[in-house]
Amino acid sequence: MNHVNKAKELYKQGFYCSQAVFAAFADELGLTEKQALQVGSCFGGGMCKGEVCGACTGALMVLGMKYGRYKADDWDSQMKANDMAIKFLEQFRSENSSYICNELLGCDIATPEGKAYAREQKLFAEFCPKMVASAVEILEQLSK
């Protein structure tokens, strides 16, 4: 199963956007799916506050695992990771108008009213999977 389909399937199962994106890459990152799902569990819904889209934070976790530093003095890796993160966010915003969850959804999901609106409009069921797919597609483009 390719990354896009894996992420969409995980999202469809009920995992957050952040979990779906990050876990779709678990194998190649040397993680179990369980580990990736656990790590991504607090980032969905714009970190539960409608902030940076969880699909984006999941993607940034993938980039951090691929390019980030694990030694304090490895600034080359840190700069590469930062560069990739900036490229990702710029591309995501270019394709989707924003990378802020509330802006993408057009409502404040940190409020009961906003969350109810998102459910009524089927945004979580129909719009968010598109953001998950977009994030994964951009990750794949950047990895070429």
Outline where the language-model segments fall.
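Short glycine/serine- and small hydrophobic-enriched flexible loop segments
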Residues: 23-27, 61-68, 137-141
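Conserved phosphate/anionic-ligand binding catalytic regions in large, soluble enzymes, centered on
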Residues: 47-61
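C-terminal binding/interaction regions
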Residues: 81-144
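Active-site-proximal helix-loop elements at catalytic-domain edges
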Residues: 1-29
